[in-house]
């Protein structure tokens, strides 16, 4: 049977059977890969520390006939300890990971998403406002999935604002043009921030000020677009974020 060796980031690790763990990774060249790490819950397992969530490393799997592979070797290159030691940073990082897992099929290359996620984690490690980095990640992930919001001008007439965001057409519509019942007002400031996120990504993100009200608008846009993209709006990591802070 074939083997797979690739750089990857551990998105999730959970107990499986008596002594194993089920590990889900986003890899550089093979997309989502899930496999069983056998015996890692036993004392002195060499693999246990290599498969903690948010660990980046080089992983080798044996691919059998089932959907799950078997983890053979792992070499951790970055444990992202700063993220894991801070509950708020950890929750934001887990949210980014959960979005990736929900958005991608298994074993289909997703190199740009892999790169984006690593950039997000690196940015979060230096962030004083982690929600800002998470919202930037949301929008750029949507763009890679083919759901980039149209923000240049009114989708219907090309005119100026004030605007509403209409999830049914994936962009902004001025108040003079018809929109669906899902449409909601979005401020010019929020539109400007979203355009900046999409144009520059994480570059000099620390100098981009995003007030709480605008964070709420941006997350609402992203949440509704993710509902269209993956059919899901509820994420466990969001519940953790809400318990830690007034996250928008």
Question: How does the language model describe each region?
Answer:
Residues 1-248:
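Non-catalytic alpha-helical scaffolds and adjoining flexible linkers that form interface surfaces
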């Amino acid at each position: 049977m074939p083997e797979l060796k690739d750089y990857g980031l551990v998105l999730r690790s959970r107990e499986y059977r008596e002594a194993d763990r089920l590990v889900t990774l986003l890899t550089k060249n093979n997309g989502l890969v899930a496999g069983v790490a056998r015996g890692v819950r036993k004392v002195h397992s060499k693999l246990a520390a290599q498969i903690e969530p948010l660990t980046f490393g080089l992983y080798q799997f044996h691919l059998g006939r089932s959907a799950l592979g078997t983890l053979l070797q792992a070499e951790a290159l970055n444990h992202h300890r700063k993220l894991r030691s801070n509950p708020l940073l950890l929750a934001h990082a887990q949210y980014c990971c959960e979005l990736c897992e929900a958005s991608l099929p298994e074993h289909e290359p997703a190199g740009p998403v892999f790169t984006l996620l690593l950039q997000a984690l690196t940015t979060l490690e230096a962030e004083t406002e982690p929600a800002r980095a998470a919202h930037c990640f949301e929008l750029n992930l949507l763009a890679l999935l083919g759901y980039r919001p149209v923000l240049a001008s009114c989708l219907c007439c090309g005119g100026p604002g004030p605007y509403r965001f209409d999830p049914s057409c994936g962009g902004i519509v001025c108040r003079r043009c018809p929109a669906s019942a899902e449409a909601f007002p979005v401020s010019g400031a929020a539109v400007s921030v979203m355009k900046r996120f999409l144009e520059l990504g994480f570059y000099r993100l620390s100098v981009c000020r995003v007030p709480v009200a605008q964070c709420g608008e941006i997350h609402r846009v992203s949440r509704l677009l993710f509902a269209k993209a993956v059919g899901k709006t509820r994420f466990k990591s969001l519940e953790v974020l809400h318990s830690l802070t007034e996250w928008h």
